[in-house]
Amino acid sequence: MNQSLKLFAKGIEYIDKISLSVTGKHNIYNSLAAIAMCMLYNIDINFIKEGLSSYTGVGRRFEFLGKCNGAFVYDDYAHHPSEIKTTLDSVKKTKHNKDYAIFQSHTYSRTIQHLKEFADVLSNFDNIIIAPIYPAREENIWNVKESDLVDLIKEKNPNVIYLDSFDKIEKHIKNIVSENDLVITIGAGPVNEVAKNLVKE
């Protein structure tokens, strides 16, 4: 799950190699910014390396929670298409067999506003499970349904289903995932409870 980067600076051919305990391009960029600030203040490179290698990231950002049937289980707070694209990039750069994205859209208004964009990015996962929309106190005045998203995803990827409860999603995942698959819950609502329950046993 680790990644490494080599440090170069203007006028200097090579500084050092640093291992990160987190994945994703955004974490590389954040690490480079932190390194630049540390070097500006003449902090020893070994101290920088030690700090970055022990950093495990923030909660709910491509957070590894454990395993289910030998499959890696992650959670991510992403709830906007651009954030989901970043999550997708992290998933695809992580070594695994098949991936399963469990997506819960956050609010009816956001769902209707970004319906096509959600479908476009989610269709790039191997398998997609749509969870019930999280209303967050909103009334569904747009009459948007989970099936609207499923239908759009199906135009690009037939491996998508809607399950109307977290319990059904958990049972489905436990029946289909195996060693070295990757499962990720995506959304700002309580969908992360699915990931937590999957790794309990």
Outline where the language-model segments fall.
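Short hydrophobic segments within beta-strands
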Residues: 102, 131, 185-186
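Nucleotide phosphate-binding/pyrophosphate-handling subdomain across enzymes
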Residues: 11-127
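Short catalytic-loop micro-motif centered on adjacent basic/acidic residues
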Residues: 73-75, 161-162, 184-185
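A glycine-rich beta-strand to alpha-helix segment
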Residues: 167-199
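C-terminal helical cap/extension that packs against the catalytic core
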Residues: 119-179
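Short polybasic amphipathic segments
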Residues: 2-10
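Short glycine-rich anion-binding loops that position phosphate/pyrophosphate groups of nucleotides
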Residues: 105-108, 134-136, 188-191
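Short amphipathic alpha-helical segments
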Residues: 86, 113-115, 141-142, 174, ...
